[in-house]
């Protein structure tokens, strides 16, 4: 008898409670500030692509969904010849964003990645590259790291410290 009354109480309590279901197309779900969604490639403040094709993102990816090939520009700047992410394999873990030294890879709160054909989930560089700078608007990797200047060794450019000889520091 007690179990039947308890069951009736639970049914009545849940009958008049508010449902947790969100009617998705009409109501947007609440996304938290650190939500990790679709991956994008950003540009630096000069409008150039930030990615220097260092391959750290592909090396750290646990499911191996990132592929890229490095090439060099005429002024010595590295950039990816192709950059490909297979979103059918991506688990949106964010390790690629953490590993990127240039802040080129950033995760956005966009979560609508469904397609009818799985081949459409392979995004090329043209699909990933956005026009803005993303989360870090003033950062430019080449202003921080510099570029090699033809005819000058390390430490000979303007406002550049000479390289440290680590062998002289050894005991």
Curated annotation (Swiss-Prot):
EC number: 7.1.1.-
PROSITE patterns according to UniProt: 4FE4S_FER_1, 4FE4S_FER_2
Residue span(s) of domain 4Fe-4S ferredoxin-type: 41-71, 81-110
Key words, A-Z: 4Fe-4S, Cell inner membrane, Cell membrane, Iron, Iron-sulfur, Membrane, Metal-binding, NAD, Quinone, Repeat, Translocase, Ubiquinone
Binding site for [4Fe-4S] cluster 1: 51, 54, 57, 100
Domain of life the protein comes from: Bacteria
Reaction(s) catalysed by this chain's protein: a quinone + NADH + 5 H(+)(in) = a quinol + NAD(+) + 4 H(+)(out)
Compartments where located: Cell inner membrane
MF-aspect GO terms: 4 iron, 4 sulfur cluster binding; iron ion binding; NADH:ubiquinone reductase (non-electrogenic) activity; quinone binding
Cofactor note: Binds 2 [4Fe-4S] clusters per subunit.
GO cellular component: plasma membrane
Intrachain disulfide bonds: none
Cofactor(s) named in the record: [4Fe-4S] cluster
PANTHER family listed in its UniProt record: NADH DEHYDROGENASE [UBIQUINONE] IRON-SULFUR PROTEIN 8, MITOCHONDRIAL, NADH DEHYDROGENASE UBIQUINONE IRON-SULFUR PROTEIN 8, MITOCHONDRIAL
Subunit structure: NDH-1 is composed of 14 different subunits. Subunits NuoA, H, J, K, L, M, N constitute the membrane sector of the complex.
Protein name per the record: NADH-quinone oxidoreductase subunit I
Organism, scientific name: Methylococcus capsulatus (strain ATCC 33009 / NCIMB 11132 / Bath)
């Amino acid at each position: 008898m007690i179990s039947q009354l308890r069951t009736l109480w639970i049914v009545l309590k849940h009958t008049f409670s508010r449902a947790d279901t969100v009617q998705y197309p009409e109501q947007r779900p609440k996304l938290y500030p650190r939500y990790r969604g679709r991956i994008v490639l950003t540009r630096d403040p000069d409008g150039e692509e930030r990615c220097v094709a260092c391959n750290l993102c592909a090396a750290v990816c646990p499911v191996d969904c990132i592929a890229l090939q490095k090439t060099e520009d005429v002024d010595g700047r590295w950039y990816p010849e192709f950059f490909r992410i297979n979103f059918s394999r991506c688990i949106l873990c964010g390790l690629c964003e953490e590993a990127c030294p240039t802040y080129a890879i950033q995760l956005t709160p966009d979560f609508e990645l469904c397609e009818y054909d799985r081949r459409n989930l392979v995004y090329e560089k043209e699909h990933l590259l956005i026009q803005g700078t993303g989360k870090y608007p003033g950062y430019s990797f080449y202003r921080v790291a510099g570029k090699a200047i033809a005819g000058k060794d390390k430490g000979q450019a303007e406002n550049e410290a000479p390289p440290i000889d680590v062998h002289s520091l050894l005991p």
